[in-house]
Amino acid sequence: MASSTPSSSATSSNAGADPNTTNLRPTTYDTWCGVAHGCTRKLGLKICGFLQRTNSLEEKSRLVSAFKERQSSKNLLSCENSDRDARFRRTETDFSNLFARDLLPAKNGEEQTVQFLLEVVDILLNYVRKTFDRSTKVLDFHHPHQLLEGMEGFNLELSDHPESLEQILVDCRDTLKYGVRTGHPRFFNQLSTGLDIIGLAGEWLTSTANTNMFTYEIAPVFVLMEQITLKKMREIVGWSSKDGDGIFSPGGAISNMYSIMAARYKYFPEVKTKGMAAVPKLVLFTSEHSHYSIKKAGAALGFGTDNVILIKCNERGKIIPADFEAKILEAKQKGYVPFYVNATAGTTVYGAFDPIQEIADICEKYNLWLHVDAAWGGGLLMSRKHRHKLNGIERANSVTWNPHKMMGVLLQCSAILVKEKGILQGCNQMCAGYLFQPDKQYDVSYDTGDKAIQCGRHVDIFKFWLMWKAKGTVGFENQINKCLELAEYLYAKIKNREEFEMVFNGEPEHTNVCFWYIPQSLRGVPDSPQRREKLHKVAPKIKALMMESGTTMVGYQPQGDKANFFRMVISNPAATQSDIDFLIEEIERLGQDL
């Protein structure tokens, strides 16, 4: 009888083969091992055991070896990895009778802690793998009332008594199951997308360290990383490496608020102690296409939204410098004191870049603080091909830059950069003696917490620093160039098709591609209020169908008097041309009968 072990002769002919083994060719071994690996560990081992009992000794060796190879290659934390410390090998653990009190720091809690965390890591790794699998849905949509009522054992209500670790693991799985896969290559809904593996590792480490950024004393390495990274970012903006300051904040809205606080303190330092009653009637300026956080800061800081003056924009969403200067003169004539303007480098909807050079000229003429909100567009500074779109940014007094947007750093990661050293410290310092003692044994200038408006501050720097180390500046440049190339591909693909209409003429400056889908019923229909009313309903209907099917996600919104349109943004380096093609085909499929 011929051996069942694969050989050149065995693969070319089945003559003389054992009839009990001819149905288990090498491809079948792989298939069954793949099935086993896809099951829970216990069931997977049962499958292998069954296959072992029904094959010869040689088959047993083949099957077990194949399964072990699959396990070790796909799950480095599995118990088959004999090189690992025995304490960190997976064992069969009954979590139904274990509770949080059984984990560390409980006495003899190490084994349960290790096994529990290995299960959590397995859940996370499975989620990561599926996130990059295009056959996986972007979301499994449910209405709020469905999730609140409970889904298949997933209950959001809090209980008085502890639940088992088995239930906690189920809750971990279901939380991911019913969420949105923002790292999926076909998720285009927000400016912040993607799932960077190095950044993910950095965030895991950050949470494990669980420290605060307010002093060098408790976060020495993280504080130094932040200083070095902020210095590098200021150099990329174009400022002197010796001067300047900055801090990471909880998002671009807070970074923008910091800029207004710094400007106000620069011109009117007495506001810190005496309040707004001690200063003249101040006004600040921003474009009608700028982020709403500028108006929100105006309300929060006591200026009032009426004193946040909106500057007109052209058809591409860029500030009109002449209107800016006219509004300065108008405010001065009314007795107001202009002191600040926000220019946007990459608007949220159109992706427009305001003319920073011309705005800077006006600021110098009238002695205004120039802030550049580059939360969305700042990443283009990393690209030699595209950084010209931010020409003049080096003339700004402050800059907001969100690496968690175009650079793909995991949320949250936003920096406020200030050209003049000492402004943030002077503006926000309160000298709390229980935190910021002046007589410590190290250089207390590294205690950065007093220049923040927060006390507790999350460590946002490590994942960013780690990604920069892993990619290098060139890696970020390539990533950003690729996303912009995909936007150009999308624009070229739809600009001349009858079923699509561009919101504005010309190629987009950023990865924002704004367009209407025109259903068959509206094609060729002249513009009128009735047509616009019908068109206004198209994007929301397609978006709703999109979410129900879970295949992809893209945002929509109105702008001024324009009907709802799709705003496609690309910041996920995992996206490809095939994903752009899929999105367009999906919009056509979902909208064809509207």
Swiss-Prot record:
Catalytic activity, as annotated: L-glutamate + H(+) = 4-aminobutanoate + CO2
Ranges that cross the membrane: none
Annotated EC: 4.1.1.15
Span list, region Disordered: 1-23
Entry GO terms, CC: axon terminus; cell cortex; GABA-ergic synapse; inhibitory synapse; perinuclear region of cytoplasm; presynaptic active zone
Domain of life (superkingdom): Eukaryota
Phosphoserine: modified positions: S78
Keywords associated with the record: Decarboxylase, Lyase, Neurotransmitter biosynthesis, Phosphoprotein, Pyridoxal phosphate
Biological process, per Gene Ontology: gamma-aminobutyric acid biosynthetic process; glutamate catabolic process; locomotory exploration behavior; social behavior
SUPFAM superfamilies hit by this protein: PLP-dependent transferases (SSF53383)
Segment forming the signal sequence: none
Residues that hold 4-aminobutanoate according to the record: Q190, L191, S192, R567
Sequence positions bearing N6-(pyridoxal phosphate)lysine: K405
Comp. bias regions, Low complexity: 1-13
Family: Belongs to the group II decarboxylase family.
Function of the molecule: Catalyzes the synthesis of the inhibitory neurotransmitter gamma-aminobutyric acid (GABA) with pyridoxal 5'-phosphate as cofactor.
PANTHER family, sorted: GLUTAMATE DECARBOXYLASE 1, GLUTAMATE DECARBOXYLASE-RELATED
Listed name of the protein: Glutamate decarboxylase 1
